[in-house]
Amino acid sequence: RDNARTPMQWTGGENAGFTAGTPWLRVNPNYTAINVEKETIDPNSVLNFYKKLIALRKDPEYKETVVYGALEPFMEDRHNLMAYYRKGDKTLLVVGNYQWEEQEITLPSECKKVLINNYPDMVLEGNSVKLHGYQVLVVELA
């Protein structure tokens, strides 16, 4: 188990801010570039993306669907694409492009609202969406 984990990288400071003492395991050498302190101030960081996901789960408008809604796969035949519905009092579509190359998908119905997007834009023409490499979307469908 020791080989799988290193001390939490809280800051870019000594021992990554994990301890003032000597840590049992060596700190990952990337701690000056990747740490909680930097992730907190970067609106596009993985940490802040997870905060957005948690906020969506807690949002009273979407909680019923996100927490208790039925999960239905969508576009299972597509390579490097994960897509599924959450259906409850609303219909949400979660789509993740797991490759560097763009992928185009056709939404099954009109996009009512973009709830989460890890890119600053979304290329939408009618019901056709062009996903950037590694783009993740959560959209509410009409």
Language-model regions, residue ranges each:
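Beta-strand-rich binding/interaction modules
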Residues: 102-119
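C-terminal beta-strand-rich structural cap/linker in extracellular carbohydrate-active enzymes
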Residues: 125-142
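A conserved amphipathic helix/loop scaffold
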Residues: 96, 123
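Intrinsic-disorder/low-complexity peptide segments enriched for small residues
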Residues: 79, 113-114, 129, 139
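Short, solvent-exposed coil/turn elements at secondary-structure transition points
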Residues: 14, 119-120, 142
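Residues immediately flanking
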Residues: 97-98, 141
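Generic serine detector
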Residues: 45-48, 109, 128
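Loop/helix patches that line or flank the sugar-binding groove of alpha-linked glycan CAZymes
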Residues: 1-92, 98-104
